[in-house]
Every structure is written in C-alpha cells, then in structure tokens.
Amino acid sequence: MKTIFHNANVITMDDARPRAEAVAVENGRITALGSDADVLALKSRAALIDCRGGALLPGLVDAHIHLLAYAASLISVDCSPAAVSSIAEIQDALRRGAAHTPAGRWIRATGYDETALAERRHPMRWDLDAAVPDHPVRLIHRSGHASVLNSLALALAGVGIATEEPPGGYMERDLTTGEPTGLLMEMDALLDAAVPRIDDAELAQAVRRASDNLLSEGVTAVQDATATNGPDEWQTFRRLIVEGHLRLPVTVFEGYESLGKLPRQALGGRLRRGPVKIAISELGGEIAPGEGELAAMVWQAHRRGRQVAVHAIGQRAVHAAVRAIEEALRRKPRRDHRHRIEHCGVCSPDLAKRIGALGIAVVSQPSFLYHSGDRYLKNVPREDLPHLYPFGDLLRAGGRLAAGSDAPVVPPRPLLGIQTAVTRAGRLGAVLSPQQSLDVAQALLMHTRDAAWSAFQDDERGSIEPGKRADFVLLSNDPASVPPDEIADLDVEMTVLAGQIAWPPSSRRST
C-alpha cells in the first residue's frame, strides 16, 4: 500500500535535494518526494499522514552500541550516577535487588562510576559483601571495561591470590596481602565464562524494552560494536528478530577471534555482518595488543577484503590504530576501505590529518562530553584538552565522522548527541574545547548519512531519496531552528520503519 507523508519540513540529508514537503512510500521504499502539490497528486489509493509542519528526517543510526549489554542493563540493579552517589547507596541498591532474588543466584548491577561517588574510589569486594553476602554479585563499571565482584562471586569465578591477569587485563590486589580486592579490568573473557547468561525469556523481554526505547528516540538502525561477537551472538540476534522482540535492523560487528565465522547477512538484510572489531586496551601506560600484534590483526582482516573497527581512546592507542591501518593500506591499497577508529578520544591535529588523508572513518560519542565533561576537565591532562574528541579538527582534515551512543555506557539519546556535538557543553554547563564544535548540519550527518556510510549502508539508509528505505523520524521542529542547547528537548513525534509507524505504537496521523 502507498503512504504519503505530507505537510512536513523534509530534511533529506541529500546534497542534491536538501529540502522537500512530502514523501511517498510504497513497499517500504521511498518512491517520490517533492512539494505537497506534486506528491499529493499521486495520492490515488494512498494513506495520507499529516506531519503538521514537523521536521521529517532520515531515521537516526546508532553507529556504535552494545545492544545486548544495553538490554541487560535495563533489568539489572541500576548503579549509574543518576541513581547512586556513594558506595553506601550502591549497597542499598544491591540490598533491594537481593530482597527479591533467591539466595545463591547471581545479582548483576551496572553503571557505577567511581568519579561520581562521594568516596572517589571503586567499591571493593568487602563493600559488596557487607550488603549482599549470600548472592554472587557482579557490579559492572559504566565504561563496560571493569567489574567489581564480591567474595562469593570471586570464588565461583575461580579468582584468587594465585590468579594471573590475562594480557591487557588487570586485577587490583591488596598491597599487604596480595588478595584480590574484587576490581577486575579488561577481564571479560574470564567473567563471561563464569557468570551465567541471562535466560532467553528475560533477555527477550529486555531486548523488547531496549528496542522500544531506541525507536522512541528516533533510532531506526543500530550497529552492535561488541568485540566478543561471534556465531552465538549472531544466532541470538537472529532469534530475537524472528520472534519479534527486536524490531530494528542490526549490523553485528565480528569479533577478531571469530574472523570469517559470520555470514554476510540474514533475514532480508535485517541482520548484517559489520566490520571486524579489534579492541585496544590501555592500562598502566601500555597498550594491548602491542603495535606489532595489532598491525598483524589489522592486516589479516584487510587482506581478506574486510573492514576493521579499532577501539582506541587515548592518543597512544589512536596512533597505533592509524599506523596499523596505514601499513595494511601500504601493503595492499584499497580505495574504499572505510576502516574505522571507534571513539578517538584524544587526537592531535597532525594525527587528525593522517586520519583524513588515509580515509579512515571516526565513529565517536558526542554524548560523552555531556555526561563526563566535568570529569574530563578535572582528570584529562591540560595539554590534551584541546584535542579531546576533536570533531572539528577531524572534519577540517577531510575525515568523516559517525556517531554512536556506546550504550549502556550512556543512554542512547541521539538528539543529545547532536546537541553536544554543537555546544560541547557538559551536564553542569562547562564547555570543552569549543574550537572543536560542529554546526547542526554536520552533527546531523554524524547521526544519519555518515553513520550509514560507516557501515557501507549509505545506499540503503541515512538520507531521504527515492529507492532508499522509508525510515524516518518526525521531530517537533527543525534542529537548526532552535537554540543549540534545546535540541535535546525536541519531541520525537513519530518513528517510521520501512514505511510503517513503529513509534508510538498506536499513532496514526492522517487526513
């Protein structure tokens, strides 16, 4: 059936035709766009949806999320800065969680940030023991790169004084006894093997909530950037889509350890294989994998014709990622490789120029500046602050930027990401490196066309053009027409997937 969305301020993100008033859709694809008069002339047997003057944009693309972890966080004990401000409050939250959890069953808690706690330190096993002695507890850091376990959980995981850290991992120990304090960094492989997975029914319920949350924010496609994705995770995503719990199309990054094990796509493109994910950890001034091993990993993916996505935050890691990609391209040039650096937290102007010259995409998180800006001002070395999430430098160097939330690290709120890319303002109002600000059009590109481009999907989504998927978000106003610090307050009035209103569920706007 044909549908026409009319009386809209259509912001197409297509340079050849940036604006329109109406869009016609059939069989999930855009068939026409133009003035109301021109498109409504095609209205025979069409359903009409009156957009009432709102801004109709391409559906927003979250180019870096951890979807299963985000879903799990929705059914975990909330220890985020919005929920707790001290270790005592973490203990209270865990006690509440334990009150309706059978003894002996694992308790999962997420989102703590030691810099937002009154004590300004990580909780330790003994803090958790005092609150919940009869349940194993895994308390996951906001970053996803650290966990604190209580004594029962450490015992079940087989972690003790004789345990050796894996390469790139770190286990904090009591300086006197050598006993683990419970804080483990970059040791997910060990923990994931020890901690029982969420059962299928719980996961399905959580993913349905996560999917609805994303749709309510105007997100119509996601890229799951989890470094441990493999065949099991692929099958999980496939099942969740088939059973109707996950309504969004998903691009699944392939963890390096699973290189070559995932199919290209399934379910008519609703599930796709993305780039090969390689994560660089940065602990104690060292990076892991080291530069030689990293270069070999990038080469193994590149020589197979694959795209890589390298997690690199600090400047040393970013530099190593650039060198590895540069070397792979020297050995085997490839014009449209679209290799990616995920995050790119600190990057000098010279390094930004190399990134631009090599055609590397940077997929970053503007919302981090909002949620952590005040912490960055306190903790980031002064000489690095001008180069913190340097979106302006990267674009001036000819680079391309895409945006993701990195949820559950921060909530998936793309309008806040767009706002923060423009304002560079933290939650308490401090502005970080204003010379790195973008204009609204550039910030929108990060969340639409260039986010799709970063996964080789700009032929399908990211702009409103005939032939592309009819994925839209209807906003209450044009983001460029409101004060920049009010962009996040715009209402998402409608989210459309393949021509069908996906959010709100019962919304039907017609004349």
Question: Which stretches of residues belong to each language-model region?
Answer:
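Short, glycine-/Ser/Thr-/acidic-enriched flexible segments
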Residues: I30, D38, G54, E114, ...
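Glycine-rich, aromatic-flanked loop segments that form ligand/cofactor-binding clefts
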Residues: P249-L271, V410
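Non-cysteine beta-strand/loop elements that form the S-adenosyl-L-methionine
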Residues: H66, G268-S281, I360-Y370
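Acidic (Asp/Glu)-rich catalytic clusters
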Residues: L240-E243, L262-L271, R334, I355-A357
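Active-site and channel-lining beta-strand-loop segments
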Residues: V23, M171-R173, V492-W503
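Divalent metal-binding segments
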Residues: K2-N7, I11, D15-L259, V276-I313, ...
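A generic structural signal for residues embedded in beta-strands
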Residues: A32-L33, A109, F472-L475, P504
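His/Asp/Glu-enriched, well-ordered alpha-helical/loop segment
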Residues: V298-A309, R316-H339, H343-C344, P349-K353, ...
